[in-house]
Swiss-Prot record:
Residues 73-88 form a propeptide. It comes from Bothrops jararaca (Jararaca). This is Zinc metalloproteinase/disintegrin. It is found in: Secreted. It comes from the Eukaryota. The active site is at 13.
Length: 161
């Protein structure tokens, strides 16, 4: 039960980081107490309330948090390689889950001869898109993101407030 309490407390604090306030009496999660309850109950809940879902969605739509909305780079994940999981892992040049991919050898997870890339916002027909090509359109105050010509990945947004 202590582990559950720690996990729910972490969920609660993470909820605050996602714009979720403490629940009021009008909020419901189907249990006696919800994760964003202002007090800890002996009946520990693992569920967020209807109010929490609305507040989190509002936060994402209004604040446009890039750390949540940006697609991760394929090389961001460190794990045991698994073919076909759409992640580029240690020892793989490309994710070899799709035999029909013209850029990637499905048997070896290596790029086919002459290919620079197999997927990514800056990959087109097995080649890196040219430097300056738009890979992610502007959102709000953030400018367009552009390919570098050296990678298949669209660079992370460089705008800072």
């Amino acid at each position: 039960e202590r582990d559950l309490l720690v996990a729910v407390t972490m969920d609660h604090e993470l909820g605050h980081n996602l714009g979720i306030r403490h629940d009021t009496g009008s909020c419901s999660c189907g249990g006696y107490s919800c994760v964003m309850s202002p007090v800890i109950s002996h009946d520990i809940s693992k569920y967020f309330s209807d109010c929490s879902y609305i507040q989190c969605w509002d936060f994402i739509m209004k604040e446009n948090p890039q750390c949540i909305l940006n697609k991760h780079l394929r090389t961001d994940t460190v794990s045991t390689p698994v073919s076909g999981n759409e992640l580029l892992e240690a020892g793989e040049e490309c994710d070899c889950g799709t035999p029909g991919n013209p850029c990637c050898d499905a048997a070896t997870c290596k790029l086919r001869p002459g290919a620079q890339c197999a997927e990514g916002l800056c990959c087109d027909q097995c080649r890196f898109k040219g430097a300056g090509k738009i890979c992610r359109r502007a959102r709000g105050d953030n400018p367009d993101d552009r390919c570098t010509g050296q990678s298949a990945d669209c660079p992370r947004n460089r705008f800072h407030a």
